[in-house]
Amino acid sequence: MLSFKILLKFSIPLIVSFSAFAEEAKKVELPPKAESPAKASATTIKFTDTDAFELVKTLDDKQRNSGDYTALAFVKETERNKEPKLYQSLVYRRDDMNKFMFLFTKPKEEAGKAYLKIDKNLWSYDPSTGKWERRTEREKIGGTNSRRSDFDESRMAEEYDVKAEGTDQLGSYQVFKITLKVKEGKDVAYPMLKIWVDQKEKNELKREEYSLSGKLMRSSYYPKWNKVYSESKKGDVYVPDEIRIFDELEKGNSTIIVLKEVDLKKLDDNMFTKAWIESKTK
């Protein structure tokens, strides 16, 4: 297991362009494995299932914007014994209507590929064939180990049943530990989650994602959260500055997601359509 304290030292600095991201990504190596923090040092306080559910609702609300959302996403995909791959994309959301759009812009061979989600329906688009295909939440985004949910708002209280697992310590952070199991009829990337939440700031710091059989599939870390003021929400929206995802099936494989230029201004109404996405490749 990776030490969260060590992980913080390896965050990528401010990224302003794809070329800058490419240069910084070359310098960043994965931190070494470290022993898990001693659980005995964690402060033990009462933490019930009701408390856990309320905390999960708080996490959802902090990330939710009542209006629209735009972000520039940089993704570094690393596979063992291979050269890392770098991607740039645009992420668009309309949270109050459950609409989501993901559009690759770089590298050239990926540009124009896209994902569109409207309510419960998710499609992918390949401009080389001009075809749309239905997708599930479990499928990877493009050639990366990311999922659509890595870029969307949090809906854990709506999609999962919540159980408190007590308190813990993650690096220097006192945390609450929570287990979530998918509700019947919900389409999610992973049917079971374990999350570690900072007791002080109420931000998610770590996540483990499991298959239906209980096998650990991915571990994700959130070293830093940024606040962006939302005029429509009349409050702050919390956005992860960076997400580090470690593949637990293929050891040595990892994904780094960096989110920049987050904008919460209203988008054009005709954007969340197949026609709009197709027009970007003509």
Predicted regions span which residues?
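Bacterial N-terminal signal peptides that target proteins for export
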Residues: 1-11
